[in-house]
Swiss-Prot record:
It catalyses: Endohydrolysis of (1->4)-beta-D-xylosidic linkages in xylans; Endohydrolysis of (1->4)-beta-D-glucosidic linkages in cellulose, lichenin and cereal beta-D-glucans. It comes from the Eukaryota. The lineage of its organism: Eukaryota, Fungi, Dikarya, Basidiomycota, Agaricomycotina. Keywords: Carbohydrate metabolism, Cellulose degradation, Glycosidase, Hydrolase, Polysaccharide degradation, Secreted, Xylan degradation. This is Endo-1,4-beta-xylanase Xyn10A.
């Protein structure tokens, strides 16, 4: 396990968040983000 500086940890957390958003198929997982459909969480196109 690599223990970096606070900056490194922040960057890693950010990358993990980006990966989560990229592979999230549930619109409500992140408000307004990560949806794999043209609809938002209110089902408005």
């Amino acid at each position: 396990l690599y223990m970096g500086t606070a900056t490194d940890n922040g960057a890693t957390a950010m990358l993990n968040l980006v990966e989560s958003l990229k592979y999230s198929w549930v619109p409500s997982t992140f408000s307004g983000q990560g949806a794999a459909t043209p609809y938002d969480s209110n089902l408005v196109k």
